[in-house]
Swiss-Prot record:
The keyword Nucleotide-binding applies. One of its GO terms (biological process) is DNA replication, synthesis of primer. Belongs to the helicase family. DnaB subfamily. Keywords: ATP-binding, DNA replication, DNA-binding, Helicase, Hydrolase, Isomerase, Nucleotide-binding, Primosome. It is an enzyme of class 5 (isomerase). The gene is dnaB. It comes from Rickettsia bellii (strain RML369-C). NCBIfam families: DnaB, PRK09165.1. One of its GO terms (molecular function) is DNA binding. This is Replicative DNA helicase DnaB. Residues 197-493 form the SF4 helicase domain. GO terms for cellular component: cytosol; primosome complex. InterPro entries: DNA_heli_DnaB-like_N_sf (IPR036185), DNA_helicase_DnaB (IPR007692), DNA_helicase_DnaB-like_C (IPR007694), DNA_helicase_DnaB-like_N (IPR007693), DNA_helicase_N/primase_C (IPR016136), P-loop_NTPase (IPR027417).
Amino acid sequence: MARNKTNNDKNIANDEASTVLARVLPSNVQAEQMLLGAILTNNELLNYVSEFLRSEHFFEPIHQKIYNGIEVITEKGLIATPITLRSMLANDELFHEMEGAEYLAKLVTMSMMVINPIDYGKIIYDLAIKRYLINIGEEVVNDAYNSSLEFEAKEQIERAESKLYDLASEGINEKSFTKIAIPISESIASINRAMKNNDHVIGISTGLIDLDSKLFGFHNSDLVILAGRPAMGKTAFALNLALNACNNMLIKNKRDNEEVQSVGFFSLEMSSEQLTTRLLSMSAGIDSTTLRTGMINEANYNRLRKEAIALSELSFFIDDTPALTISAIRTRARRMKRKHNLGILFVDYLQLIRGVSKSDNRVNEVSEITQGLKAIAKELNIPVIALSQLSRAVELREDKRPMLSDLRESGSIEQDADIVMFIYREEYYLSRKEPAASDPKHAEKYAEWQDNMSKAHNITDIIIAKHRSGPVGNVQLFYDSQYSKFVNLETKYPVHPR
């Protein structure tokens, strides 16, 4: 009985699929003919539709060739007429099959009935989008039936969602020229906000005063690269920045009566539990080893619970899915922007992201990833902070302070980033250079080493190596490794370690 029902369901599904495939794709050949004829009669009309209409939007192949020919001719500063088009398409096989010269004359004749050519352009565009939508639907169905595909169902859904979003955005959200008065008004508003703020931070505050004085906060549409060698504290620093940003956005949103903005954190390496343990450690002031082992007294536990409740109420979202593609990250970020008003995005880390296109060249793949991250920042109008590894070349030289050339697969990373920051802890490298006891000058060298260690103790350098809209330079922070916490170094600031 159950088997018969299953077979019936399959038969119904197959019949429905056959019906869908048998349908004629939506098109309006007459609208295409009338628009092309109107443009051939008056080339100025091309300016009104070329902003959203492309040759591939036409259904008939001959119309695609004619529209493309008109664009090529007019771009050269010439006039597109049946005569100039006939000369251009003289060797085209399809043009000859359609008796092109007579067909062009027919189009011009039909244009006499055109009242508003822009309306015809919109009809052609709308029908093309519907055909693309049908193609996406067929791809989704075929992929779902194909069990040999390497993609899991969830990833197929994300791929479909990404294609649908791209289709929805096509031609509609494309930017064109904007009268200068609009961006000037936005700039003045931004300057006014900065004047009202005592700290003159016009972006999302990092919560670290000296760093804010260099960056002026994190800015919408910026791609920020935070790079460092292993054990420098990249993830810990990113978590500090994310938590500070979350708290500072909440304060601003409440003050200005705005919708609460969220922090998104993609963790491709560590689990969400590992990240939240670190967040609890830095918030409660209890080292993470104590938290993991459970060796905690009642007073600390009560403080921990209080901080856990406070953190739980924040609009802070973690996605710890490993090996995400840049396309999946874009899809999930879009979804979060829509559902939770995403205000800033962190990605840990860049080298663990997979490109969409299959490429044996890692440099090209990283270029695709960094361009994708920058596109997310611009599209969603948020800062994107991406962590990055540095090459081993750092370890091979005496001076371990990072440089732009140390970025792994560095060309595109440096080019696409608005800000490149390096995190560097001299103490880490000094601790591995303790003078050997067998050295004849051990006492002298040991005293010098101890002095250097004392100066570098708990100090982290944030090296701003590239800043598209501001100064570069070095900022020193106090790093409490016990609690994975970064705070202002100077005692003159409200939050400091002394």
